Amino acid sequence: MKITVLCIGRRGQEDYASAVQTYTDRLQGSYKLSWVLLASCALEPTKAKQIESDAIRAKLKPNDTTWLLDERGQQISSPELSSKLQTLKNTGISRLVIIIGGAYGVDDSLRNSVTWQWSLSKLVFPHQMVRLILAEQLYRADQIDRGSAYHHA
């Protein structure tokens, strides 16, 4: 299954980018994980959300399953994430798109159109850290599915 992460922002600090790449490489046997960075907009919040959301929508395909990382989304455990991904894999979807909006999030139209809204935590993190946490959690979910000792909670 292909997983594409659409992120608003820039590449960022090398140490974060390197760690994200490490988890991305580790996942390649199970998922084809790719990261697409889209430019952020330095306008007032409402206009920035609209322009950034339009850029995200332009990258979506009609049959994509879409998850939005959003502080108002549902929080789940790592084993629940593993199960959710396995269910998608078993249903034969071609591509899961995980969306990380800009500093002000995404517009309501995009938020309301996604398949699922997911919150990594009640805490707010910098975008680069969100990418790293997401990459690690996708890897952890895969390891849970494989019965690996990586996850031992």
Language-model features: where?
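N-terminal beta1-alpha1 ligand-phosphate binding loop
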Residues: M1-L27
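Conserved RecA-like P-loop NTPase ATPase core
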Residues: V5, W67, G101, L134
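Structured adenosyl-cofactor binding patch, chiefly the S-adenosyl-L-methionine
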Residues: D108-H152
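A mid-sequence interfacial segment
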Residues: Q86-V124
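S-adenosyl-L-methionine/SAH cofactor-binding core of RNA-modifying enzymes
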Residues: K32, V36-L96
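Short hydrophobic segments within beta-strands
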Residues: L6-I8, V36, I99
